[in-house]
Every structure is written in structure tokens, then in C-alpha cells.
């Protein structure tokens, strides 16, 4: 929410909240209800940022299901677009959604909903060509933008050069048109920090200090002080 309040152009309500908020090992257990509920809280706070919602795993396993659930997400949350992770099979799904006037963002490279091992993608010529072709097919299907996750710098640069739609990088170098990070990662709240993450502040440490100080003051009867009393009631 905070990035959208200070000038970020886009906010993605991603299924990675499974790891960040619930402490789960992967994103597979996030449900449609989870994503809708969390998106509602974000929608209430943001003003100008484009709001994109990540469709949970298994919510778009076929064209009919994808259309039904995408429409439900948009209706319930008022978001601007949905995001689909690519498995090299859902180009027809993207095409169908776009024809139904639903804005779609693609996602290639490391796709947490379909891949278990966290590694650099597109680091060989053969793998790079597959990713380039995949990106072009997603663009052809009608996606308005595409996330490149954990893709080698050289391949990310090639993809960005070949596409007409914007590429949004996460762990894919500066050779992308835009960048995203998990808010909790950049603020230093989460406990896992991949190499591509830059912590702009260590909120974990700040929060820890604040809670310790609060606990100490309560035990020493320093909080609440008279300044915190209601109606000017003096402490006896």
C-alpha cells in the first residue's frame, strides 16, 4: 500500500503473500478468497497506482475457469488487471480474457506457481530462445505488460528489445522497462532476502527496538503516562 501512496505507478497484489504474510513455503495454497480479501484492503488505500491482481494457482487452469475467476476478481476488488504466470500453455487463456475486455499482465522466468527450484532462468542460448518465444506469444495474445522474474541480464535485455509491451523486472537486472519488489523485502521486514533485493531500511530492527521499549515501559509502569490518559485524568 505504502509505495502507491508515494508515487509508485503500479501495485501488484501477488500470491507471494503466502510466504510474506502466512509463512508458507510456496504460493500454492493461496485461494481466490484470500487474494480477493487482501486486494480489497489495498484498493481502499491506493489512489492513483495501477492495481494488478495475481490469479492464484489453479484459478485459471482452463479458459472457462480463468474467465469466470478473472471476472470475479475484478468485480469484487475493482482492480485494473489480472496477472497470469506462464506455463507455456495459457496463451489461449490470455487471448480469451483480453477479448473479454480484461487487461492481462504476463509473467515468465521463475514462476512460483509452477516451478519449485529458485534459480536463474534463460542462462543458456537454448533457454533464452524459449523465453523470448514465450514472451512474444504472450504479447501476441494481448497482454499489456509482462513480468520477467529471475532472468539472466542478457536474456532480459533481449526480451525487452524485442517486445513492444513493457517488461517489469524482478531479479532480472536493469535491462527492463520497470521494476517491482516485494514491499516487505525492500523495507527489511521479511526474513528471506534474495541477492536481487535491496533493503532500503531495516524495519525488523526498528520494530524490535520499539516493542522491547514498550514492554520495558509497561513493566516499569512508565506507560501509559499521564500524557496518555483520557479526559485529562491525573494518575494517582
Q: Which residue ranges define each predicted feature?
A:
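Conserved anion-binding
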Residues: 50, 60-61, 74-141, 176
